[in-house]
Amino acid sequence: MQAQKAEGTRDLIGAEMRAWQKMQQIAAGVFEPFGFKPIETPAIEQVDVFVHGIGQSTDVVRKEMFRVFSGANLERVFTEGTDTKLKPKQRLALRPEGTAGVVRVVVENNLVPQGSTPFKAYYAEAMFRGERPQKGRLRQFHQVGIEWLGAPDPAADAECIIMLMEFYKRLGFDLSKLRLLINSMGDAQCRPAYREQVKQFILDHADEMCDECRERAELNPLRAFDCKNDHCREIMAEAPLMGDNLCDECREHYEQVKRYLDAAGIEYVEDPTLVRGLDYYTRTVFEVEAPGAGVGSIGGGGRYDGLVELEGGKPTAGVGFAVGFERALLALQAFGSDLGADEAPCVYVANAGKELRQNVFAITQELRAAGIVTEADYQGRSLKAQFKQADKVGAKLILVLGGDELAAGKVKVRDMQSHDEVLADLDNVVEAVRERL
């Protein structure tokens, strides 16, 4: 049986791998001037990190999170039919998103003591969700994101959105083809009453709505705004709106965010039905869509002022966002663009006889030590076959070493496009190559 990748996963090779690397480079170039520093968290966390942070009632925790068990613990789970008897440190999961893990790092290491400098971090990591694989939805996918803890001011919300749109611009998006949606989800003071209003609205229309929405009425009624059923969406269009139920503090926070965005020239659309799928969001939420690309949201985020406390820390404001690599790449391609990284020009060193391989080996090492991408023959090909291989790997130059050239202390340097050819001194081969790349 031929080995195959798991369903819902992709191999990042060639141009796609270079695109992922380029996205990470762009992320560093955009986020670091704002004071953000790179962070990497474990792919495996204790389940409670996500249950407390994302929310027990969310689809991510209930339906999509991959659980991880060692051999012995897996046997116990199969035998007992539950993992509740395992110790917390034995109940593990693959991270489905980045924020909860970063917050766990902050809480565990006390990185935002009261009155300290805010904690700013960005990440580029693989995430895992047990979703039904389809276009733009994978079981292992990649995200670039930022987390800003210790910044309650609405200016931080606006600055995150400004960073996000600048990131899309650097990726190669025409921002006029993107749509930024914003909303406020209120906070612990005003959202509970609103949640009850939406719950009652769904119950009043239960016989008209899908099974999933009826289930959500008890667990997470606001998620009904995200239902993909057209009839449910029509019904939810008449539901009470958070904007009509904001407390004075949340309303003023939201208005200030909009004023900052207006001052920065950021175009946005207010969407009073916009909710995020994770329970930790408070106040400002935002998403970026690529209409016409067929991939839905390509990124989003918001404020999460209660998450640090949920993870066992002291009350600390937070805000952040994440961008899906695979979806962003699909959207770019739909718009006729790409994220292909510029490859360094390649040099191929060919030998005119097996007896010259040692000399070719020395030349390749010298070129590589100088940072020049260099290929050579390792299969005993003929000179003609080496020329074909040089063309196949996209070499800009081919260096040909024959017995006569070696005796004269020279090497032929040939441009693969123009076919211009010169003899260069072996003692000066690096400079000769650089002049022609």
PLM segments and residue spans:
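TRNA-recognition modules of translation machinery and tRNA-sensing kinases, especially anticodon-binding
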Residues: M1-L437
